[in-house]
Amino acid sequence: MKVELFDFDLPERLIAQVPLKERDASRLMVLDKKTGEITHSTFKHVIDFLNAGDCIVLNDTRVLPARLYGVKEETGAKVEVLLLKQEEGDVWETLVKPAKRVKRGTVLSFGDGRLTAVCTEELEHGGRKIEFRYEGIFYEVLESLGEMPLPPYIKEQLDDRERYQTVYSKKQGSAAAPTAGLHFTEEILDALREKGVHIAFITLHVGLGTFRPVSAENVEEHDMHAEFYEMSEETAALLNRVRQEGGRIISVGTTSTRTLETIASEHDGRFREASGWTSIFIYPGYTFRAIDGMITNFHLPKSSLIMLVSALAGREHVLSAYRTAVEHEYRFFSFGDAMLIK
């Protein structure tokens, strides 16, 4: 299957550069995956499309302020360090710019020495393993010194970094937000509970690979990045009960979808307490074992994310919906509008 099949024309002006003032003011396109029929709404009315007994599944990961600006202690030369993955203790896999300035043994300093680091290993493509040294709690130091690693297509500064976090974010570890969840407010979550809609949480720490373009010519040749996930026993039990009682499982975002499908595919369509690394790549032809629908944002042309959405709703339905979204000037990507596939 050719990657070109997932291309579409997107005017640059429709790429949302800043979040809306109110989270739930985003528009909501509702797509019927069987018929391709479209309904236009707003996110604050998402409750109207969910039934008592359904379950939405949210990713409670929290984005790290993972971009650090510092200097080499020896020369004062400026360096930028992007945290990718915690290895062991205070050792992290990072991306360093300019990489040539940082060799094994190089000592770096951030925030007037409040945080220092030594390079322990050189990796390919500008990657470096770095061991941090600090006083106190690492994540508190990082909160005070780090900046949010916004996606490459967002050029504006983010005034309020909490707007790149979901209201239910808890577990530190992501390099990017699970953006479908950015539309939810505490009021919407309360209203869903009041209606009898179950709310379940999983964790998947989003890696920067989520922004990596599909460079292969054929979809099947794409090498999917791996991300860490976990599901609690409580969530697994709830999802199994919802399934047994005939409710729908609606994942919020591609990250929740990939977590649920990873676990269900390994346990014959059922859910269990689990954690590990997933590199599941979902594209048309995939048979879903976990979800009945999903809430997601509007994705980049030819991305692995639009392929996942097409696997659920059908490529032609999705591309037709995206053309309609462009015509109606929906906002695209991380700070953009939402789609409910049901």
UniProtKB/Swiss-Prot annotation:
Entry keyword annotation includes S-adenosyl-L-methionine: yes
E.C. no: 2.4.99.17
InterPro entries: QueA, QueA_dom1, QueA_dom2, QueA_sf
Subcellular location: Cytoplasm
KW Iron (keyword) present: no
Pfam families: Queuosine_synth
GO molecular function: S-adenosylmethionine:tRNA ribosyltransferase-isomerase activity
Spans traversing the lipid bilayer: none
Keywords: Cytoplasm, Queuosine biosynthesis, S-adenosyl-L-methionine, Transferase
Main location: cytoplasm
Reaction equations catalysed: 7-aminomethyl-7-carbaguanosine(34) in tRNA + S-adenosyl-L-methionine = epoxyqueuosine(34) in tRNA + adenine + L-methionine + 2 H(+)
SUPFAM superfamilies referenced in this protein's UniProt entry, alphabetically: QueA-like
GO CC aspect terms: cytoplasm
Pathway assignment: tRNA modification; tRNA-queuosine biosynthesis
Gene Ontology biological process terms in this record: queuosine biosynthetic process; tRNA wobble guanine modification
HAMAP family: QueA
Similarity field: Belongs to the QueA family.
Function of the molecule: Transfers and isomerizes the ribose moiety from AdoMet to the 7-aminomethyl group of 7-deazaguanine (preQ1-tRNA) to give epoxyqueuosine (oQ-tRNA).
Subunit structure: Monomer.
Protein name, as recorded: S-adenosylmethionine:tRNA ribosyltransferase-isomerase
Species per Swiss-Prot/TrEMBL record: Bacillus licheniformis (strain ATCC 14580 / DSM 13 / JCM 2505 / CCUG 7422 / NBRC 12200 / NCIMB 9375 / NCTC 10341 / NRRL NRS-1264 / Gibson 46)
